[in-house]
Amino acid sequence: MMHPTIDIKTFLKPGVRAHLAGIGGVSMCPLAEVLLGMGLIVQGSDMTESDTVCQLRAQGIDVAIGHSAENLKDCDLVIRTAAIHDENPEIAGAIARGIPVYERAQAWGAIMQHYENALCISGTHGKTTTTSMATHIFMAAQADPTVMIGGTLPMLHAGYRVGKGDTIILESCEYCNSFLNFFPTVAVILNVGEDHLDFFKDLKDIEHSFHAFADLVPQRGYVISNADDQGAREAVAGLSHPVFTFSLADRTADCYARDVAFFDGCASFDVMIHGQLYAHVDLHIPGKHNILNALAAASAAYVLGIPGQAVTRGLEDFHGAGRRFEHKGSYHGAAVYDDYAHHPAELHALLTTARSMGYERVICAFQPHTYT
């Protein structure tokens, strides 16, 4: 893998031509739109035609189908997805011509430095749901955020939005230490467990990665961590600045839930911060674990000055993200849900949630996915 010696930030200016290899990808399409909005000339390539490709072309972005060194034209830099390796003809062509090649995460890391607030939400589980919750809250507060989510959010009809506000919200993945390319002003750690063991050596290695991620936060920023999770506690131990904690019931935490009640599997509770009522929340997605996700999103909103009313309104309107216990309909009277859970801990939370909803029988069809 080639490591450019020129900081990608030097290219983020009007008139620079950027080629995005794999431009139709879930986080490459919004990247293209953000770069276009910054005044860059954006072009790219993808393997197939798609609605995303059509959407990019409608904005004046030249998208080639198929990968070829000829697609590079006279570009100044190349940005690629993780799925595109050095053997790809565009990457090989760029290297041969001395055109710097950057990873997608490097580009997002450079972009977030243009925002006053960079809210990066990490964790072994719950990232997509919590990032979606935070998006609803900041939208309710009319903060007009730029958002990058690893799934589809019905409110956006996509997994991203490009806003004009001073906040960017990103789902931040630890795989291959990707999130260490970021520059968070607020880093959220939901939980830390064994995952991606094709890359990490063991749990300690994973905890070290999350610690390094939290350590990226400047002194003026905030690290928000789950006080109920052992791995998260280990990850933030020894940080040079204070940690803002959230908990389901520990009243010594900065943020905790009070008066929790369940209705058809969905929780209703008060969000308490420093012993004071910040917001009341009525969730419309089931599961005890989603209380913690909501507390994490509320904590991030609080430290960034969002009023509690926006938390209440935003979560009132949140009905889940795509493939996160997503109700698809019914079959012969049985409710059918789709969920991306593929880690043992995620499966446990999923089945516990389903059983809490009063169904007489729960059947799970599971397709193994990813190394873990």
Show the residue positions of the predicted features:
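Hydrophobic beta-strand scaffold residues
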Residues: V42, V63, G98-V101, P145, ...
